Amino acid sequence: MKISYLGLFLIITSCVISSGSTIYECKWRESVRFQKKENPTHKFCETSCKEKASADEAIYEHSYKDSSRCYCMGVKHVKYGYPSDVVKYCNAI
């Protein structure tokens, strides 16, 4: 009987310890607004999105929203999978 309690204790302990180190992969989307009325090009949006992203954010798509904005979309890895205005759709990995 003591062995089964010990086994149960070890299983619960390992689950608690492993859950503390979960990493989340989150999709993010943000728009870049232009200061002047420019006609955004594919290259301009790509450059603007790369400048906007931090080191831990991978860009997988950029597109035009309208004549004054580009959309930047990508994936980032974070410790906490809480959605925000920019971060959406987090999955534990």
Curated annotation (Swiss-Prot):
Keywords: Disulfide bond, Secreted, Signal, Toxin. It is found in: Secreted. GO terms for molecular function: toxin activity. Contains 3 disulfide bonds. Expressed by the venom gland. GO terms for cellular component: extracellular region. Residues 1-22 form the signal peptide. It comes from the Eukaryota. Belongs to the scoloptoxin-15 family. This is U-scoloptoxin(15)-Cw1a. It comes from Cormocephalus westwoodi (Westwood's green centipede).
